């Protein structure tokens, strides 16, 4: 751990005027034919600590659903399931997390190009469960027991696309082909084309004959039940009109391509501007909430859907669930982009409650903490600058029917995830830097999210290397990183200021060298909610080379607590 004044990183609070979250009631497990009564299990989402897991990689609790498993081949199913999650809820409690974000549950196109859909993002039928993960009874049992322990469940969903459910019959021979276009003559480009995944075409993917273009390529739905490569379901999702049919995106900076194009890999872009498609998506996912008593959605690829979709989808979902007794239902979106203004746009106009805070992941956790280990570190003034943009870029008022907290105060903070290399990969295994980053994650404003395996010092690189098998760790709860997280989650739980308080930056610096304050970042968390407001002072030294100080040599750091009135305790010491 980096040192401040030669002592451990300081997370100090005044004898913690604490307000911990009350225990919530038990939930019985309904039979397959019964739906659970919907209930609101969350008082304030800022009290939660999210743990993102890939079901297939977390724990294998039922070998009976281990068909097509190839142990150790990370592009293939490994056997994790919902029973495995249920069997290890005690592990998650010991870590101190309070909400589980589970990977998509619906039936997928099983395999493509020798890669399996273990992740869940190649959906084929929104009305059926993925049999690799278990059945309805095992999923309900896991969720009911999680709720019984005070754990909440966020479901990963996709509104942008379906899996590889059809092909473009470019050569009009009625079967999917991979072939080379071009005569091979001088100056004639040679292009390999897959009818499963052709490139973007502004007017739609075209068919060709020997005479040249012959109009829009017919869309032909597949019928291969052995790997679920069949027409999308339900209803309208099995019709040509439900898809844009433009081929895959070539330029992700082109808004038209980004919102109308297929996702690379043959993932078919839905015509989400159509009222019938919108209604189908709202209904299909809401039915799973009703069947399972889920507590929120993490929504994939939100920047690839037209912006007008999100207020409609979110508010229709809120109204439907509230009528059945489910409020404070969290919906946060994933837009893989460092543009803070773009991220914030998804919270405007009463749309999403929150987003995955990618701009912070890139600028802060990569730029400041990770790069401290490998060179090119940014100053901590970059953290303050980004935080100051929140009130400009994110909605600052409570969304009607939403979670009761403005999006600007409920951003989902994370260090890494399943789409980027793990922190320890990029930092060359620097666990001190990781622990420092985790300290910020669990004390800053917003909702912290921890990617599974972080607690076990996983260090995988790019996909699928960053989607390791957790049970190979034997669920060790004694490691330094596991214990560091557990201590921080306990501190957070005990301090209402760290969960709900206002934030004031007290020291940031552009210095990253040998200056006296190089790498220092300090902030206060104050208040929370009456009747027991709290106080916490967080001081971090991101400099890997020296014990820095909260001074520039002449001016010391000032805090809001009057001198002589308060005793601060180093709760990480």
Predicted regions and their residues:
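N-terminal Sec signal peptide cleavage junction
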Residues: 19-20, 26
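Substrate-binding/active-site clefts of carbohydrate-active enzymes
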Residues: 42-48, 58-98, 103-287, 291-292, ...
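Active-site-proximal helices and loops of the catalytic beta/alpha 8
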Residues: 143, 161, 191-207, 283-406, ...
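Solvent-exposed beta-strand/loop surfaces of large extracellular or lumenal domains
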Residues: 569-573
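Bacterial N-terminal signal peptides that target proteins for export
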Residues: 1-9
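Structural recognition of the beta-strand scaffold that forms the well-ordered cores
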Residues: 49-54, 99-104, 125, 152-156, ...
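Bacterial lipoprotein signal-peptidase II cleavage site
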Residues: 27-32
